Each structure stands twice: as C-alpha cells, then as structure tokens.
Amino acid sequence: MRADWIAKRRGQANVSQMHYARSGVVTEEMAFVAARERLEPELVRAEVARGRMVIPANVRHPELEPLAIGITACCKINANIGNSAVTSNIDEELAKLRVCLKYGADTVMDLSTGGDIPQIREAILRASPIPVGTVPIYECLAHVKDVADLTPELMLEIIEAQAAQGVDYMTIHAGVLRDFIPLAAHRITGIVSRGGALMAQWMLANKAENPFFTHFEQICEIFKRYDVTFSLGDGLRPGCLADASDAAQFAELKALGDLTRKAWEHGVQVMVEGPGHVPLDQIPMNMEKERELCSEAPFYVLGPLVTDIAPGYDHITSAIGAAVAAQHGAAMLCYVTPAEHLGLPDIDDVREGIVAYKIAAHAADVARHRPGARDRDDALSRARYAFDWNKQFELSLDPDTARAKHDETLPHEAFKSAEFCSMCGPKFCSMKIHGHLAEAAAAQDAAANGEAEKPAGGLQVLP
C-alpha cells in the first residue's frame, strides 16, 4: 500500500513522520490514520509535530497499514511474539502473528532470542500489516560469547541492520545509567527487565557508561534515515508491588525524558515505556509523572500488574492495571499472557492475552469518551435484547469463544433464534419478561391515548 508514498521520499536525509509534520506536511500516513481515528488530518500533523503522537512506519516496511499511537488516538495494544534460545520455529511464530492479526493486536514485537533471528524477523515483517518492534540488544548477544564483549560498534551495526530490514520501532535501553544501578539494590526483585539487566551487567564489567546512552545521537541518525520510532525502554521498571514508584524507576524516567527531547531535536519519533508492577492506587500518579518528565510523549505500559499472587492469571491482574493506566493517559498497552513469569507463551496464551488487553483498551476508550467508542457496545446490547445470538457473536471481541460457550449447553441451530439462554431458560429470562412488560405498557399507553383523543375526534362509531 505504501510503496508509492515511500518512493517520493527516496534520497532524503530525514524521512521521519515528525520531520514532515514539523515542516507543515500532512503525509499520506497522517491522512490515513486521521481517517482511521476519525480525526482531522491537521490535528494528526500537529500532534506528531508536537511529539504527542507517533506513527511507527519504517520506509522499508511497505506492507504496513499505518496507525497512530497517542493520547488523541484510540488506545492501542501490543502483542509480543518470538522464540527463545530453547525453542526456535519460524512457522510457529508466523502462526502467532496470524493469531495477533485475527484478534486485533495493533502492533507486534519480535522478541526472538535464539535461532536465526534475522530470518525470523524477515518472515514476520513481510507478513505483517501492523507495526513490528524489536529489542536489538537480544540479537547483539547472539554475536558474542558474553555480554561484556559487546561493543558500541556492534550494537550500532545491529540497529542499522534491523532498521534496513523494516523494523518500525525499537526498544532502546538508554536510560539505565551507571549511577542508577545502586538504586535498585534494595529491591525485592532487583532489575527485572532483560535489557536493563544486560546493560547493567555490561556497565559493571566494563566500568563504562551505557553505550546506548553515549551513542544515542548516532542511533538518532540511523532512525531518521528509515523513520524508526524510539520505544525508550524502562530497564529499571519495578518487578513487584513492593518495588513500584521507587528512586530507581523515577531516576530512569527522568533520563528518558531528557533522551526524548534529544531525539526530538533530530526529528525522530519517540514513545516511552513504563511499568511493570504497580499498586492500583499508584497508577494515576505514575501516568502523571511520565507526562511531566517526558513532555507528554506517548506512554507505552506493560500492564501494569496490580497484584503479584496470581501466576497463570497475570493476563487478568495486568489487564486491570492496563485499563486504569489507559484511562489516565497511557497510549499503548503491552499485553501480558497467562504464561507470564512461568514460560514462553504458546498460541492459546497469545490469544488470551490479546483479548484481555483489547477489553482493557476498549474500556478505557469508552471511559475517555472517544468518538464512536461505545457504538459496538450499544449494537451488541441491542442484539442481546433482541435475542439475535448470531449478531451478538459477530460483534464480540472473540466470536469463536462466545459461540462455543453458548453452544456448550444449547448446541442445536434452533437455539440461535431462542428467546433465552441456558442460564435462565424461557421462564426466568429477565429480558424476555421485560419485553412482555414493555409490550403490555405500550398497548396500555395506546389505549389510553385512544380514549383521550375520542372527544376531539368527532363522533364515535359504536359496534
């Protein structure tokens, strides 16, 4: 779809959406997302120019259908896929991608850490109409025996290779600084971000500052040539409730704000990653803190989980926090699956995580009164009251599961037009009872109106 749009920009030094927006240009991508979001194109341009909205759209990813991430857009969700050093299967990752597309993930991140990482990423990019993100440090590690052996040159080389391949956004852990490492020492769970832990290990081994930080402007130069969006990683995010909102987390967040503004000087798009594990009552404060420190750059949060006691159900514990975070301004939610803290998610875990987060994002859109956000809810409610079962299935977030649950107890096709379900049966269905009451009330009103109109209507013909 984007091939012709991209061709016009060939040879330009900066092809980022922010660069064009600041030049007063409404790109085709901006016009596309404006129509998609029911926004004016000029508003989209202004939000991208300001840095409050991003459109991750690498010029090497022509298969992409652009979308907007920001406070003025609908809340988006990301799904993570990718193999591990223990399991590596391209077909399985593509199957996961298809599940992501089927159930409505807005973006996908390839977090592969084993096998032929570039080959897996290439397959995902060429099959994905949604933005694809990565964490470059994972591939960097595949080239060395020990994290201490990483060099800034290798890291920049991998980043450039991924950008040239078409990656739309990258998690760069540039805010984990040497001075911040001791701040995490008192924590119950320490540093739980893989990227954050790896960079801390590198800094301690090399007695040097984080190379993502020291070479940040060189990364900006790469990103603006391809229009890669920064997803500034929260390497010091809290990994349990007890560690939430501590000095380490907010020291890094302040550094991420400084880096955000540095990237904007280069005309590069930025979103900022956030926690993690946060008690429910602290979530609004965390959202406000990000807006304040990061100049309103879009906030991309992992959950947050609001309790630590439910392994196997963390798609639920985190979706609760995600809904609150989105209501208070988070622009994108990174899903959590039932396998979180337990193992690599399979296809069923991916589906359950996406559905949980679609619910959270949608609930927040309704709460924030997004234009048209409640249309689907109202349509499904009307179908429910009319006992239009097939319409209810069609409008649901997960039609297959809705239909299967209904058919467990009422499997015959005749029950698709029944005015009851197996919960209440025909005798106790409240909606059916109310329907009869409404009909009776309407008939009574009609009769009363008829009686009232008789004197004004002239002679009454008696039977």
Swiss-Prot record:
- InterPro entries, alphabetized: ThiC, ThiC/Bza_core_dom, ThiC/BzaA/B
Residues that bind [4Fe-4S] cluster: 421, 424, 429
The pathway it acts in is:
Cofactor biosynthesis; thiamine diphosphate biosynthesis
Query: What family, per the record?
Result: Belongs to the ThiC family.
Instruction: Name the positions where Zn(2+) binds.
Output: 277, 341
What does the protein in this record do? Catalyzes the synthesis of the hydroxymethylpyrimidine phosphate (HMP-P) moiety of thiamine from aminoimidazole ribotide (AIR) in a radical S-adenosyl-L-methionine (SAM)-dependent reaction.
Query: Quaternary form?
Result: Homodimer.
Q: NCBIfam families from the entry?
A: PRK09284.1, PRK13352.1, thiC
**Which coenzyme or cofactor does it need?**
[4Fe-4S] cluster
What is the reaction catalyzed? 5-amino-1-(5-phospho-beta-D-ribosyl)imidazole + S-adenosyl-L-methionine = 4-amino-2-methyl-5-(phosphooxymethyl)pyrimidine + CO + 5'-deoxyadenosine + formate + L-methionine + 3 H(+)
Identify the HAMAP family for this entry.
ThiC
Q: Which gene encodes it?
A: thiC
This protein is called: Phosphomethylpyrimidine synthase
Instruction: Determine if Signal is one of this entry's keywords.
Output: no
Assigned keywords, A-Z: 4Fe-4S, Iron, Iron-sulfur, Lyase, Metal-binding, S-adenosyl-L-methionine, Thiamine biosynthesis, Zinc
List the Gene Ontology MF annotations in alphabetical order. Answer: 4 iron, 4 sulfur cluster binding; carbon-carbon lyase activity; zinc ion binding
